[in-house]
A protein has these predicted regions:
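Residue-level signal for the short linker/turn that defines the boundary of a DNA-recognition helix
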Residues: 15, 25-26, 52-55
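Short, basic-rich loop-to-helix N-cap that marks the start of a DNA-contacting helix
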Residues: 49-61
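Short, charged recognition helix plus adjacent turn
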Residues: 2, 62, 70-82
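Alpha-helical residues within the helix-turn-helix
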Residues: 22, 33, 62
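Short alpha-helical DNA-recognition segment
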Residues: 25-47
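A short, Lys/Arg-rich alpha-helix, primarily the initiator
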Residues: 1-23
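Residues within the helices of the helix-turn-helix
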Residues: 18, 29, 58
Length: 82
């Protein structure tokens, strides 16, 4: 099992967060306002250009009014086999 993270895995996380944002019917600007961050912050995450840790994913999920556990499950499924 590899113990490193590849850039495409960050894109998977970003794509799942973007999907959650779209399900919430929010623009990147609206999501950023809820998170107290900038639109570019949201964009960088969604494009896989910025790393996010577990706690940030929980905060982002809450800001999107998404269930963090369901979001983690979606990320795990989308990331493929270990």
């Amino acid at each position: 099992m590899p113990m490193w993270i590849k850039p495409e895995q960050y894109r998977v996380v970003g794509a799942c967060l973007a999907a959650a944002r779209r399900r919430a019917k929010l623009t990147q600007i609206q999501a950023a306002e809820r998170l107290g961050r900038t639109q570019s912050f949201v964009s960088e995450i969604e494009r896989g250009l910025r790393r996010v840790d577990v706690l940030e994913i929980i905060l982002i999920a809450r800001g999107l009014r998404a269930n963090p556990l369901k979001l983690f499950a979606e990320i795990a499924r989308s990331a493929g086999p270990a």
